């Protein structure tokens, strides 16, 4: 029989009594020299870190990415250098608008943030369960997220401000259509697709760049929750998706996704009739078919939620040689915003935490800061250039190829492309009658109580996408088409 562990303070000395505070006599006041009590209360006061401003409610798991098809003609990234090669991963799912204690069965996009622990460093693809987003320009992101949160005065959610924003943002229509479709409430995290959403880039050994979209196709099959079931679960089991994911992995029913890409050459992008870097639109799979890359499997639950899920930090700025960014405006905004959020929320040295630490060597000149641990660079120099032969040196061979740009610096109107409607209309026409009816009823229910001016403005967008789309919602809302 194993020996019992001795309880200690955070500094290591043993604790003699964890039941009774020190006091002046059995009925007297407590004593300030009870360092165990003081430490315990002080640490308790500081247990929470700021929750994520978005994607606060989340679940995570470790897994493995396995290469199934050769794509070395597109990328020199070493994790893809041979078929069958495996790379450890960590995947965090989430809702977007809700707080940490909210239900994970709400109608909301789901975050799909994937970290690859590669031999060249960490690579993150920070996506969602939808291929598009509500806005094109990160300048509008704080405004949009405010509409998904709570009113400043009452601290209540508001359909009015949500639809008011969308009715002034016609580019949101494609994502709105997806959100209120049957896929707007996935049945847990295992039964939904994932997407990188943004356009990224791949760079091969010749220095050639291709634009890429990432897709994760669930092998468990798509399953969604009916609104009534989702509402019931929100009251009876608000952690339904977390429970489902954790339980499946614990019993060995490991969820898997088929990983695919779409590829577009730079020449194709330059000549394309649509902006391939517009995250409110998808690429045609007829024009740019899916190419299988590999398989993602989740096979290990975290041992501690706070340490490994709450403190997990993902960012599109985490890249390895052979992958890169694109002129996608939202992606470029996220490159700053995500890393900055982690510095505020988790700390300056968040990359040193085990869940965020790369499995490859780290050789940088960054030093000190809050909660720096390990050797902190030891006695090595903390400046560059320097005269030390064994100090880290830049590696020009990993430079990305030049990207040709044109145009004067200005604030260009990102709404000059006025086609906000064709993609939403095409999606509506792909739906069967049952799916269309569900979409219309979901939207009409969500618009109940919204002011008539907002309803009228939003209805115009539905009509422009497809007359039947607009007519159905107008009828469900009891709005006269006259």
Swiss-Prot record:
Biased composition range(s): Polar residues: 1-23
Catalytic reaction annotation: 2 H2O2 = O2 + 2 H2O
Annotated heme binding sites: 338
Superkingdom, taxonomy of origin: Bacteria
InterPro entries from the UniProt entry: Catalase, Catalase_3, Catalase_AS, Catalase_clade1/3, Catalase_core, Catalase_haem_BS, Catalase_immune_responsive, Catalase_sf
GO terms of molecular function: catalase activity; heme binding; metal ion binding
E.C. number(s) listed in UniProt: 1.11.1.6
Known cofactor(s): heme
Cysteine disulfide links: none
Keywords: Heme, Hydrogen peroxide, Iron, Metal-binding, Oxidoreductase, Peroxidase
Active site residues of this protein: 55, 128
Region (Disordered), start-end ranges: 1-28, 370-395
CDD domains: catalase_clade_3
One Pfam family hit: Catalase
GO biological process: hydrogen peroxide catabolic process; response to hydrogen peroxide
Cellular compartments per GO CC: cytoplasm
Family as reported in the entry's similarity comment: Belongs to the catalase family.
Function text: Decomposes hydrogen peroxide into water and oxygen; serves to protect cells from the toxic effects of hydrogen peroxide.
Name of the protein: Catalase
